[in-house]
Amino acid sequence: MAFKHFNPTTPGQRQLVIVDRSCLYKGKSVKALTAGLSSKGGRNNHGRVTARFQGGGHKRSYRFVDFKRLKRGVFAKVERLEYDPNRTAFIALIRYEDGQLSYILAPQRLDVGDSIIAGSNVDVKPGNAMPLGNMPVGTIIHNVEMKPGKGGQIARSAGTYAQLVGRGQGMVILRLNSGEQRLVSGSCFATVGAVSNPDHANINDGKAGRSRWRGKRPHVRGVAMNPVDHPHGGGEGRTSGGRHPVSPWGKSTKGKRTRSNKATDKFIMHTRHQRKK
């Protein structure tokens, strides 16, 4: 993928850098694999704000992406690569030999016309899905299951990947982008390759409006609020908050660990925090 730069005919175009998507399909998504999506504006079923700084944005329709790859042993051909407004990665429309259509996350180096398959013993090439226990050590993978049959949960964002660095006793060791190393069952499925659109990390919106198009509202600092709204609020003139950084609910932020799932601690061999010491 390449970047697109613009002549600064307007101030918002001067710093604008976006990913060139000219290689993607320009038509509509497959209707049978698409559903309507209503905007929540960060509100729950009571109408109360549960996710701040969300709302507005362009209307979207949801694409059903197959994260499980349950159709095993059947070859599929890549029909086209598409843009998906609901995620940073691109998606690929594939057609199985029996005619069924499906969307999957598009990995890097997957092109239109390529043939892919999911199964127990398949070639190690981008787009193919197989159990982790059958992959060679060192394989770059994405869309990794954490529980067999649950569907991929790890490494689904643009440009992300995990690496299989070891195995033993029915488990495999994965190294994640964060530096964490964790054990996962060898019967969990994953897809070979890294996720498409790695240049997403280098885009520059150029203006606030582009964030608004995505449904992102301005992120207001606590020190700019009143005392009723935030622990850092209030004070005469500009203040620094007067205490260690906290959330609007008084919880310590900037580094405090919040993980509380002790049942799965035994699967984490090397935490992401150890890398920073």
Curated annotation (Swiss-Prot):
Return the Pfam families for the record.
Ribosomal_L2, Ribosomal_L2_C
Q: Residues annotated as region Disordered?
A: 222-277
One GO molecular-function entry: structural constituent of ribosome
Q: Which GO terms describe its cellular component?
A: large ribosomal subunit
Oligomeric state and partners?
Answer: Part of the 50S ribosomal subunit. Forms a bridge to the 30S subunit in the 70S ribosome.
Example GO BP: cytoplasmic translation
Q: What is the recorded name of this protein?
A: Large ribosomal subunit protein uL2
Matching entries from PANTHER family are given as: LARGE RIBOSOMAL SUBUNIT PROTEIN UL2M (PTHR13691:SF5), RIBOSOMAL PROTEIN L2 (PTHR13691)
**Which InterPro entries does its entry note?**
NA-bd_OB-fold, Rib_uL2_dom2, Ribosomal_uL2, Ribosomal_uL2_bac/org-type, Ribosomal_uL2_C, Ribosomal_uL2_CS, Ribosomal_uL2_dom3, Ribosomal_uL2_RNA-bd_dom
Q: Which family does it belong to?
A: Belongs to the universal ribosomal protein uL2 family.
- List the Gene3D superfamilies hit by this protein, alphabetically: 2.30.30.30, Nucleic acid-binding proteins (2.40.50.140), Ribosomal protein L2, domain 3 (4.10.950.10)
The organism encoding this protein is Bartonella quintana (strain Toulouse)
Tell me which HAMAP family the record gives: Ribosomal_uL2_B
The family database entries (SUPFAM superfamilies) matched by this protein are listed as: Nucleic acid-binding proteins (SSF50249), Translation proteins SH3-like domain (SSF50104)
Q: Which residues form the signal peptide?
A: none
Its job = One of the primary rRNA binding proteins. Required for association of the 30S and 50S subunits to form the 70S ribosome, for tRNA binding and peptide bond formation. It has been suggested to have peptidyltransferase activity; this is somewhat controversial. Makes several contacts with the 16S rRNA in the 70S ribosome.
| UniProt KW Ribosomal protein keyword | yes
Ranked from the top, the taxonomy reads: Bacteria, Pseudomonadati, Pseudomonadota, Alphaproteobacteria, Hyphomicrobiales
Q: Which SMART domains match?
A: Ribosomal_L2, Ribosomal_L2_C
Keywords attached to this Swiss-Prot or TrEMBL record, sorted alphabetically, are: Ribonucleoprotein, Ribosomal protein, RNA-binding, rRNA-binding
